[in-house]
């Protein structure tokens, strides 16, 4: 009887996470996968908001996007987009794939 108890204690000490009473299964990101009755069910975890002890983490540093940053990205991409569309329209017209007709304005 004592040897059986000693073996069980040794097995518990060797097995990782054996004394942890949380959901059993693999942890993937912010969701624990737990074997359930119909396959795997997911239990949400708040590891991004709180620490393991339950303390709330401080707010992350907020990066401010000024108008200069927004315009420095938007304006060049708008310009490149208009150049691409203008060149593609000229290519279509050159190969007579799409030629706009000016005769339709007399309705």
From Swiss-Prot:
Gene Ontology BP term (one): mitochondrial calcium ion transmembrane transport
Superkingdom classification of source: Eukaryota
Alphabetical UniProt keywords: Calcium, Calcium transport, Ion transport, Membrane, Mitochondrion, Mitochondrion inner membrane, Transit peptide, Transmembrane, Transmembrane helix, Transport
Annotated transmembrane regions: 66-85
Residues in the Mitochondrial matrix compartment per record: 48-65
Function: Essential regulatory subunit of the mitochondrial calcium uniporter complex (uniplex), a complex that mediates calcium uptake into mitochondria. Required to bridge the calcium-sensing proteins MICU1 with the calcium-conducting subunit MCU. Acts by mediating activation of MCU and retention of MICU1 to the MCU pore, in order to ensure tight regulation of the uniplex complex and appropriate responses to intracellular calcium signaling.
Entry keyword Ion transport: yes
Keyword Mitochondrion listed: yes
Protein name: Essential MCU regulator, mitochondrial
Locus of motif GXXXX[G/A/S]: 81-85
Tissue distribution of the protein: Widely expressed.
PANTHER family named in the record: ESSENTIAL MCU REGULATOR, MITOCHONDRIAL (PTHR33904:SF1)
Subunit text: Component of the uniplex complex, composed of MCU, EMRE/SMDT1, MICU1 and MICU2 (or MICU3) in a 4:4:1:1 stoichiometry. The number of EMRE/SMDT1 molecules is hovewer variable, ranging from 1 to 4 copies per uniplex complex, leading to uniplex complexes with distinct gatekeeping profiles. Interacts (via its C-terminal poly-Asp tail) with MCUR1; the interaction is direct. Unprocessed form interacts (via transit peptide) with MAIP1.
Mitochondrial intermembrane face of the membrane: 86-107
Molecular functions per Gene Ontology: channel activator activity; protein-macromolecule adaptor activity
Family label: Belongs to the SMDT1/EMRE family.
Gene Ontology CC, one term: uniplex complex
Domain notes: The GXXXX[G/A/S] motif at the C-terminal part of the transmembrane region mediates interaction with MCU and is required to activate the calcium-conducting pore in the uniporter complex. The poly-Asp region at the C-terminus mediates interaction with the polybasic region of MICU1.
High-level lineage: Eukaryota, Metazoa, Chordata, Craniata, Vertebrata
Post-translational modification: Undergoes proteolytic degradation in neurons: degraded by AFG3L2 and SPG7 before SMDT1/EMRE assembly with the uniporter complex, limiting the availability of SMDT1/EMRE for MCU assembly and promoting efficient assembly of gatekeeper subunits with MCU.
């Amino acid at each position: 009887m004592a040897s059986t108890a000693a073996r069980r204690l040794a097995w518990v000490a060797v097995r990782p996470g054996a004394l942890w009473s949380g959901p059993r299964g693999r942890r993937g990101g912010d969701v624990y996968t737990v074997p359930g009755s119909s396959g795997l069910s997911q239990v949400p975890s708040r590891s991004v908001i709180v620490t393991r002890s339950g303390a709330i983490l401080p707010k992350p540093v907020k990066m401010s996007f000024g108008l200069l940053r927004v315009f420095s990205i938007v304006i060049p991409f708008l310009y490149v987009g208009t150049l691409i569309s203008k060149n593609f329209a000229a290519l279509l017209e050159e190969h007579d794939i799409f030629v706009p007709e000016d005769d339709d304005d007399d309705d």
